[in-house]
């Protein structure tokens, strides 16, 4: 009987509602932890010692709109989404396509831009067999549908989702997103977006 008051005090901590919202954690830290690879110009890359690119500037704008500072964390492809899923990073800004598979694992912002699908290879990747190159050049290249790029974050954070959407909407509405797209991508960011 003497432990009953203590147990009653612990019950709220065991409740699923006791889970802290991501936006509260971000506000408490005063920073938005943004994971990226920093190796894919013009999206995000290092110019000397300076991190720059379309998504770097977008991340800074989003953090400013959330009234926190942007903390960019350079990581690799293997850790990028895993780190967001585990809570190591708040978001990933690394030209991530909004796919059904990823929608099962993450919540996403609305798309911030669209890009045409491209054949990309890493600088240090071994050359592909000539047969592949010939196959790609023999036929007329086909252009696939544009790919929506969006910002993934941990599922189950509706307050953060709303805050991120509001920040992105303000950046889109006042023309800053369009200016970034023109500067870095030579394209309109929101031309075909809903």
Label each residue range with its predicted role.
Residues 68, 72, 78, 96-102, ...:
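A conserved helix-loop-strand patch within extracytoplasmic ligand-binding domains
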Residues 39-42, 78-79, 97-101, 125-127, ...:
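Solvent-exposed loop/turn segments at secondary-structure junctions
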Residues 1-5:
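Positively charged n-region of N-terminal signal peptides that target proteins for export
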Residues 49-57, 75-78, 154-162, 171-175:
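Soluble non-cytosolic domains of exported or imported proteins
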Residues 38, 113-121, 128-165, 168-184, 187-194:
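Periplasmic-binding protein-like
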Residues 14-20:
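Sec/Tat signal peptide C-region and signal peptidase I cleavage site
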Residues 21-95:
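Extracytoplasmic small-molecule ligand-binding "clamshell" domains
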């Amino acid at each position: 009987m003497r432990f009953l008051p203590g147990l009653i005090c612990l019950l709220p901590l065991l409740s699923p509602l006791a889970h802290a919202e991501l936006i509260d954690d971000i506000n408490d830290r005063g920073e938005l932890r943004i994971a990226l690879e920093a190796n894919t110009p013009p999206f995000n890359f290092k110019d000397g010692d300076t991190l720059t690119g379309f998504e770097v500037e977008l991340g800074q704008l989003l953090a400013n709109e959330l009234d926190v500072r942007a903390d960019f964390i350079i990581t690799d492809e293997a850790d990028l989404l895993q780190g967001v899923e585990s809570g190591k990073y708040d978001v990933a800004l690394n030209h991530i396509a909004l796919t059904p598979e990823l929608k099962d694992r993450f919540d996403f912002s609305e798309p911030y831009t669209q890009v045409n699908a491209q054949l990309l290879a890493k600088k240090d990747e071994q050359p592909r067999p000539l047969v592949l190159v010939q196959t790609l050049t023999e036929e007329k290249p086909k252009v696939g549908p544009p790919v929506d790029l969006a910002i993934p974050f941990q599922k189950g954070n509706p307050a953060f989702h709303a805050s991120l959407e509001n920040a992105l909407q303000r950046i889109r509405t006042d023309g800053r997103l369009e200016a970034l797209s023109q500067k870095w991508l030579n394209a309109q960011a929101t031309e075909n977006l809903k």
